[in-house]
């Protein structure tokens, strides 16, 4: 654990503050990129300057990462069996995980909490990541925090961009005809068998949801199905529209959703952008949902899938504790690959570039990859995206009124198609873990696809998996059949 003399720290700050203005201008130039990070992970003395940069030019909020992390706790308490579980077994496992993570955070954060409380500093603990967020931390307190052996590092609150969609067309039609995406992946064939996702709950972390929309009003789970950390609103709402569109693509009625019989829940982490602290709060909510005031968490209400149409940077290991906790709880994480395809190879963003999350690229009606869709390999060398799915001109619900619709393009629209497909699979055969679900999905794709505009890495786009199409375009009928046969 690095320790610093405060005088040396101030000297370093004074020396390096000369570059702060230039760095801020550079950050502005990068601001339009998907997943742009307005700050850099902070470690050692040079990183403390990044904290000063943030306090001068950003949100004044830092995140203190504890040295012990969460992985040893999860390894010790979570049931790592890959067997198919009953729902009761899944809920008991989640309860064990939540109890252990809470106790671990309480013990490891004790000295830090005492220090912050004595200084009269506002803070909030996140047990899912074993971190503490602090608002307006004075510089003189930073050295004391870093001197604690229980503290690993300080990072500052990141601004995370939503996966920005491309508007295609507006529509107020209330047609019940299935969208082209659901038809393309043969979700409609699954519906014909009577499976529309019954018994499965899907969560999203996004801009909220217009819960009264005609496509979504009937299948919200109700209590413990909504959390707005900033405003503590009592019922779902969405001032942006992005979250309504993505949710309806997963579970919406009137032809919008892949799994219209599934239930939904949501946590509002974003406006036009999201913050890392809000993502942490919502990730924790998904593991143990609370009432609308953030109290009385109930692991029995945890969703089976969390769909995320946002991302930031590349190789961001900070998200790993969140993914580890969800995986241990058999909550399957789905992420959009990103809309930075114009940058070429290795443009897939985090957290979808993790081995423990599904990353989804976007295709059009002819199965061609959208020009905007990010491709691999990931910066950690993994083949990404994992799968591709419809994501061009996807018609879904919008937030203008209860019968408002819009067609959008983006990997934000593709990830919900995979989330809905997984919901259909879990409805047919509940209880799969992430690794088993990946095995089922990867063996069930359609691979007669157009040649990609470019190939990345060492393999051709005709060999699967590859860094353009992953394992191929999802096929819900094949996935459900494979789940039933597993």
Predicted regions and their residues:
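Protease zymogen maturation seam
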Residues: 27-41, 144-201, 213-215
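Inhibitory N-terminal propeptides of secreted protease zymogens
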Residues: 47-166
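Subtilisin-like serine protease catalytic core
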Residues: 52-59, 75-76, 153, 178, ...
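Extracellular S/T/G-rich loop segment that most often corresponds to the catalytic His/Ser-adjacent loop
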Residues: 206, 349-427, 431, 473-480
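Short acidic, glycine-rich surface-loop motifs adjacent to enzyme active sites
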Residues: 286-316, 336-337
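Secreted peptidase-domain scaffold signal
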Residues: 338, 465-468, 473-486
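Cleavable N-terminal signal peptides of Sec/SRP-targeted secreted and luminal proteins
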Residues: 4-24
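Hydrolase catalytic cores
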Residues: 247, 265-270, 347, 391-464
